[in-house]
Amino acid sequence: MSIRCAFLFPGQGSQSLGMGQDFFNNSEVAKKMFIEASIQTGIDFSELLFEENPLLSQTEYTQPAILLVGAMAHKLFTDETGIKPVLTMGHSLGEFTALVAAGALDAVDAVKLVNLRGQLMAKACSKQEVGMMVSLGLSDDAVEKLCEEQREAGLQVWAVNYNADGQIVIAGIKKDLELFAPMVKEAGAKRAMLLDMSVASHCPLLESASAPLEAKLKEMLKDDFISPVISNVTAKAYDTKAEALDLLPQQLVKPVLYKHSMANIDDEVDCYIEFGHGNVLKGLNRKATKKPHFNVSDMASLEATIAAIKELDV
């Protein structure tokens, strides 16, 4: 197959009741992965995902659930097509699923790893009320300048996710974000709203989580990448265990350069395939690319994506 595919994986915020259930009900391969992940982590994923469960909003449960469904979707697609990506990329948590797709992490090991990542992040944020907010319609420079000015004034706020032009997520202490939101609107943002997040991702508040995450990564990462992975920290490709060990702990405390990553890779690919529930990244990519973007989130979208890729490759 000559078509160049980039495999994409979403992060936190893409979770939803019932995600992965269609795979579980209709694929023995998916069911086996699901059961093995439940045994290895001690998390009953069917109870977590297929029934109303408040735990799904807690990061130590959200992260393994999202990764599991994304890895499941990816496995079913690649088992049926044999397609290898020219590169893999994820948004925040999604970078770990991208490592699974690149062959550098076993899927169930990765579920365990991000369960730990969530626990470490929750612990790092447990002594103060933290949060995240999104700014829409303001430039990167304007948001960064505001953050810097307000940090000098004593607020703890950082620009942490560069998602798309005019869309930036800010993390910090919750009461500081509540003070900061009206300042962002006054500066010209169309919207500034707090997100339903229990942690403050990709900022210095997570410093204490980096070392223990790195220690676990050393145990689990493999050095046999089948494709490069795009780093959230640098917006550039890496394909060795040593690079991953350097970059992934940094990812906890440094911004996600998602829109920069898209700009860097768009000329190298013919289409994007997003694995996991929903199509969050398709929305972010609308302004960044004119290339086709497919999503694999259930059995119907799996078959539709396979058919569409065959059409593109004629």
Explain the meaning of each model-derived region.
Residues 253-270:
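A short, acidic, amphipathic alpha-helical segment used as a generic capping/interface helix at domain edges
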Residues 24-25, 149-150, 185-187, 286-290, ...:
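Short, solvent-exposed amphipathic alpha-helical segments in soluble enzyme
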Residues 78-81, 185, 266:
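Non-catalytic positions within long, well-ordered alpha-helices that form the structural scaffold/packing
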Residues 305-312:
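Short amphipathic alpha-helix with an adjacent loop that forms part of the alpha/beta core around
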Residues 62-64, 200, 255, 259:
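Glycine-rich phosphate/pyrophosphate-binding beta-alpha loops
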